[in-house]
Amino acid sequence: MRAPGRIRREKGRHALVDDIPFALPVASHESPALIAAFTIDAGAAAELLVGEEVHPLRIWGERALLLISVVDYRSTNIGRYVEFSIAIACTHGASAGPALVPALPLAQRLFGTGQYVIDLPVSSEVSVKGGKGIWGMPKHQANLDFVIAPRTVSSQYDLDGQLCVRIEVDRPRFERLPLAMRTSNYCAFRGMLMKSNISFKGHAGFNLPLTRSARLLIGEHPRVQSLTRLDISSRPLFSGYFPSTEGILDDHIDSWFLSFKDPPTSVPQGLESVAGLGQSQEWLAPPDDPALGEPGAQAATP
């Protein structure tokens, strides 16, 4: 899928936003990634979505979808970093859409289909400064890795010396399926619902649906305890691995005030959380990940 013409026309231009220099378009190159989708309870998922205009995308009955995706961004405007996304597939509108239909390519624009990002730890401080301060993503710096082994690809997310989340995906036998798509990310920041779009392409491999091809482990850190209430399926609906991707993050952002029936009583996180951040590309120490001991395992490094 081609990026919009406006983005293609930006090629070769430059921007300076929040003191971060960007060579446009905002792109990534040669970046491997993994993805795994698990079914979850739609009612419990709805409790994690802020506001009343974003709704869990139901796959069937009262089952929605938890999306775990991790990217080893090897070449970007702001250096190399790992990004660990925890999100819920969603629709955007006054009411929830029917089951499954919003996931169909021709219906996605009608239903505002995308993913609501619950948590987005990253390796570097500058990634937090840009991703959160500009696009409103819930980024924060954490202990992350991305490990490619002969039979598996995995990532572990630690914080404050505790395990938060670990995901491991079996490597498919065939990893050369061409794939290109565009998706939307929804996030809550500064009392607003923020929407950003990303286009990416690459070659991928996918495992058979509903097999034990991916393993998700939720730790005991308080930050991720809400995930334990989602009734996450033991087997993924699908899982896959991208040996390399090329991506473009749209510099256009949509935002709406988050409104409620009653006046909000708590102040949402705002610009004070990013105002003092610098542009360091240094990573925190890697987590204590058992995958690092596998023969032939290769871990991402700064």
Where do the protein language model's features map onto the residues?
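Interaction-surface and assembly-scaffold signal
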Residues: 2-20, 119-302
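N-terminal ordered "arm"
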Residues: 18-69
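Catalytic micro-motifs at enzyme active sites that drive phosphoryl/nucleotidyl and oxygen chemistry
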Residues: 23, 72-78, 141-143
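Solvent-exposed loop and beta-edge segments used for protein-protein assembly and interaction
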Residues: 28-30, 62, 78-82, 149
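Hydrophobic residues positioned within well-ordered beta-strands of beta-sheet architectures
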Residues: 34-36, 84-86, 155
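Generic structural motif
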Residues: 40-43, 73-76, 91-95, 125, ...
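Glycine-rich loops and low-complexity Gly/Arg-rich segments
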Residues: 60-63, 91-96, 111-115, 144-145, ...
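Hydrophobic/aromatic-rich structural module bridging two neighboring secondary-structure elements via a short loop
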Residues: 68-119
